[in-house]
Structure formats: structure tokens, C-alpha cells
Regions:
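Fungal secretory targeting signals
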Residues: 1-23
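Low-complexity, Ser/Thr/Pro/Gly-rich disordered linker/stalk regions
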Residues: 17-223, 227-306
Length: 306
């Protein structure tokens, strides 16, 4: 009780003073009573592309053991060792080939399901990871980064396949021109949500941009990303939440969301969706081969919704 009140007081003080809210992933998880946790293991040495695919499908709980564009990933030596205790461990590298854009043109995608007891139905989840980009990384117009997905349709709510409240939802991270960051989500858009200046909706089945430009990625170093999703409850109420922390500083926090209108929709796990200078034409294409890198992937969950 004391810790919960202390956390509430800290947030209130920060709001009054205009200070940024800063917290470690574990502290955020604790404040929302996310008591179940796990991490995704990494190998002890670099692996070839084929060995990387074998390692991931045997060591990570990947849905249907399927990795889209698996030829673009491998475990390599950390290009930006930070002096941390795990800096000598390999990191997961994703390659974007010269001229690539959109699906099938560089990057990788899969879902790591998380169901510790076999019948767990998470209503809240926090995912954290570190991501780095080549020093000379050209952001072009944008690309997608991992986040959280849920619902019975494990392959929906991406690529223009819309959310209807009973099939699925996804919340991912995106970079835009110059490394500007945002949350990019497929969920329901109740009346007036799209009139909110913090949301940019699309009527063609694609996702919604949330708080675009509220933070920025920096190339040539590690960036800590932490995403919290809490599903709406009751089902017909837009009180779901997404929060995004960049380098442990709160950048986005929206709690007027409707992820679902059916109790068939709950949180499945980690959506590794590192796509490809995501766009529909060659103006999104990377002019040279570049890479992103990932390490220290952790998750916390709870069966309690918002």
C-alpha cells in the first residue's frame, strides 16, 4: 500500500512541476501490479542466419514456429557495447536490404506467445527491449518496431487488416522521418477519438498513429523502449491504456482506447514486427543496406484489465 501511494504521489508531483516521469521497467510493472514476468533468452555466441532461425523457433515461444523473412535476421556481436554486464552477449540483428520497403523487402515479423500456466488470459502487459540502429542509418519516411498483440486472430491487425473488436489488436512502435517516434495501433476508433489531435486515424483499414513525434530515436546507440498495454474494461467502454517510455522517460500515455468489444480478445504476447521501411511505394525505400539490433527483451503481465 505504501509503495503504491508513493508512486501515485511521485506522478502527481511530476505533473505539477512539469517534470518528465522517469521509471525503470520493473518499477512501472510493480506500479501496475504486473507480477508475472519472463525474458526471452539469447545465445552465448553469434549464430548464422540458419542457426538463428533454429534457435528462435526452439527457444522462443513463436506462434506456429513461423518467422516472416527469417533470412534477414541473425545473432551477431554487439556493435555498441555499453559496458553493461551483458554487453558481451550477442544481439539480434535485423537487415534491411538496399531498396527495400514494406513487407517482403527487409526486416522480420513473428509473435512470441506468452502463456505461463497454459490457460492465462493476460489483460495487461508490459514489454521492454533495447533497440539500436547503424550509425549511418537513414530513417527515410518510417518503419515499424516491436510491441504487443492480442486476440484470437494471430495474423490480423497488420498490413491493412483492420481490427473489429473481436478479432485482434496490435500496438507497435514506429519511427518516422528523422527518427521521430510514435505508437502505431490497430484497435477500434470510437466516435470523436479521431478528432483528438493526438491521434491520426486512417479510414482504409490501416492503424492509428498516437502522439507522433513525442520522442526521437538516436542512431549509433542503444535506445530503451518500454510499452504498457491495458485492455478496456467493461468491453463497451473506451478506457484502455497505452503508455510508451523512451529511455525510461514517459513519452506517451493515453487511456481513452477501446481495444475490444468481445472477451475473446486478450493479450497474446510480444509482437516482433520490425518492418522494412513500412510504406506503400519506393519513396520509403532505404538507399543502402542498414540494420537494427535488439537485446534485453522482457515482459510482465497481469489478468487484470484497466
Amino acid at each position: 500500500m505504501f509503495e503504491s501511494l508513493a508512486w501515485t504521489g511521485l506522478l502527481a508531483f511530476a505533473a505539477v512541476c512539469g517534470a518528465a516521469t522517469t521509471a525503470s521497467p520493473s518499477a512501472i510493472a510493480h506500479s501496475y501490479s504486473l507480477t508475472t514476468s519472463t525474458h526471452l533468452p539469447f545465445p552465448t555466441a553469434s549464430l548464422s542466419n540458419s542457426d538463428t532461425k533454429s534457435y528462435l523457433t526452439s527457444s522462443w515461444p513463436i506462434y506456429d514456429k513461423t518467422i516472416d523473412d527469417a533470412e534477414d535476421i541473425s545473432f551477431v556481436t554487439d556493435p555498441f557495447p555499453s559496458g553493461a554486464s551483458d554487453s558481451k552477449s550477442p544481439v539480434l540483428r535485423v537487415t534491411y536490404g538496399k531498396g527495400s520497403y514494406s513487407e517482403g523487402g527487409g526486416g522480420a515479423q513473428f509473435t512470441a506467445l506468452w502463456n505461463p500456466s497454459g490457460n492465462e488470459k493476460f489483460q495487461s502487459m508490459l514489454v521492454t527491449y533495447e533497440v539500436a540502429f547503424d550509425t549511418d542509418f537513414d530513417w527515410v519516411k518510417g518503419g515499424k518496431l516491436p510491441g504487443i498483440r492480442g486476440g484470437p486472430k494471430e495474423n490480423g491487425c497488420s498490413g491493412g487488416n483492420a481490427a473489429d473488436g473481436s478479432n485482434c489488436f496490435t500496438s507497435r512502435v514506429m519511427w518516422r522521418t528523422g527518427g521521430a517516434g510514435e505508437v502505431y495501433s490497430y484497435f477500434l476508433t470510437p466516435d470523436k477519438l479521431c478528432d483528438n489531435k493526438n491521434f491520426e486515424c486512417h479510414s482504409d483499414g490501416y492503424g492509428t498513429s498516437i502522439d507522433r513525434g513525442s520522442f526521437s530515436f538516436v542512431a549509433g546507440q542503444w535506445n530503451r523502449v518500454t510499452m504498457l498495454v491495458r485492455l478496456n474494461n467493461p468491453l463497451d467502454t473506451a478506457n484502455g491504456q497505452v503508455a510508451l517510455y523512451h529511455n525510461n522517460v514517459e513519452a506517451i500515455n493515453q487511456d481513452i482506447l477501446q481495444y475490444r468489444n468481445s472477451d475473446d480478445v486478450y493479450i497474446s504476447g510480444f509482437f516482433f514486427s520490425d518492418i522494412r521501411f513500412a510504406g506503400g511505394d519506393s519513396s520509403y525505400a532505404t538507399p543502402t543496406e542498414v540494420h537494427s539490433y535488439f537485446r534485453n527483451i522482457e515482459m510482465w503481465g497481469s489478468t487484470k484489465a484497466a
